[in-house]
Amino acid sequence: MATDALYNEVAEIIRCVLAKEKSVRNAVYGSSYKNKKALLRLSCESLKFRPVFDEILQDKELKSMKRDANIGGSVELLYVLMYETLVGSGLTRCSQELKSVISRRIQRIKEVEHAMQDEGRGIKAMKEADDGMKKIQIPRYARINTLKWTADEAMKTLETEKWKILGTLKPENFAEMVTKMKDDEVYVDPHVENLIIFAPNIQNFYEYWMVEQRYLILQDKASCLPAFLLNPRPGSQVFDTCAAPGMKTSHAAAIMENQGKVWAMDRAADRVATMKQLLDASKVAIASSFCGDFLKTDVTDKKFSKVKFAIVDPPCSGSGIVKRMDEITGGNAEKERLEKLKNLQAMILKHALKLPGLKRAVYSTCSVHEEENEQVVDEVLLDTYVRQNYVLKKNVLPEWTYRGLKTYEVGEHCLRANPKVTLTNGFFVAVFERVKSSE
């Protein structure tokens, strides 16, 4: 049935997004499914309510749904079916096989959701939270790709195309001025070099030639912080440990003026292939992109001996990601999953800090959970080797007033980002520096 095809395509898009392979828009517009509008809407909506669905699926009577033969092991397809059942237009137009996945358990699904609602965690609560988020206007951040042109050339070209360049914002009135932006206005960001700001609701901005041809790279401001704070010198070597889709790799290469080398590793071969395409389109000439498991990588290998800088942006819950079209890919991740992520993140960071020539590493997540942020930093700093060789850099970007949680000693030395406070995705950054130079 046609609706089954839609549901299966949405499930694949959700899988890609949660695996950090593609953004929702890139996945939708790269799909062969013709009705892009329906595809985009259902993908965004299913992702938005995913935290509720995840909690429902934790119920002991409903866990078996994940093994239902009719969904072929796709929990992402379950998200779509549950969205249509609990929020959307129902399952009236899909096949009997897909309907049965929900219909055989519908009473228990509703019981669990109602119990969640009584505690303020159900569908209604999510809708109310979403109404609040709609009032937050996150602008479109675009990084000038200095591998293709200079910042001056970019600004002059924007002016010739009738954009109004309003200059550099001041940090103290950033939010006030950004929320008043008109669609033809452009600001220069006060924190991140070569980052400019457009109004949040510009239509078809992805099709603008500067964006399509990657003269401007659409990248959330918070996501620009890792490479910006790493600040690798031209001619140096960087290791991007979990690199796909390559945004931070391309940013590092731009800062390095395409001089030196960036080792860009990721576990998934298809993500590496996509990353290579994006890096090529961005004119990155110094990236060595390859598939591999960083935890199984011999960081003492001679070929990595000149690596002085590392970007550690490991898999995370994605709880900070708030996209346009009300697309929320994160949420209240269950504690068991957070604990597993925390352990993985700490292992990856500790392994990166064992690069023998390393001078500086930036750890980042697009998560709001302290388990993945301050707790990881705390745990890593307790490691004997790390404690003897590294310190957490203090006074990082002092003009950035939104810091880590005060309940942790490391908090004041870390950066946090939040849609309501910084007008960005939720994010966390910490900078580690070697106590003594390895040179």
From Swiss-Prot:
Binding site for S-adenosyl-L-methionine: 266, 293, 313
E.C. code: 2.1.1.-
GO BP annotations listed: negative regulation of cellular response to heat; negative regulation of locomotion involved in locomotory behavior; positive regulation of rRNA processing; rRNA base methylation
Keyword entries, A-Z: Methyltransferase, RNA-binding, rRNA processing, S-adenosyl-L-methionine, Transferase
Annotated GO CC locations: nucleolus
Cross-referenced InterPro entries: MeTrfase_RsmB-F_NOP2_cat, MeTrfase_RsmB-F_NOP2_dom, NSUN5_7_fdxn-like, NSUN5_RCM1_N, RCMT, SAM-dependent_MTases_sf
Record-stated family: Belongs to the class I-like SAM-binding methyltransferase superfamily. RsmB/NOP family.
Protein name stated in the entry: 26S rRNA (cytosine-C(5))-methyltransferase nsun-5
Species in which this protein is naturally found: Caenorhabditis elegans
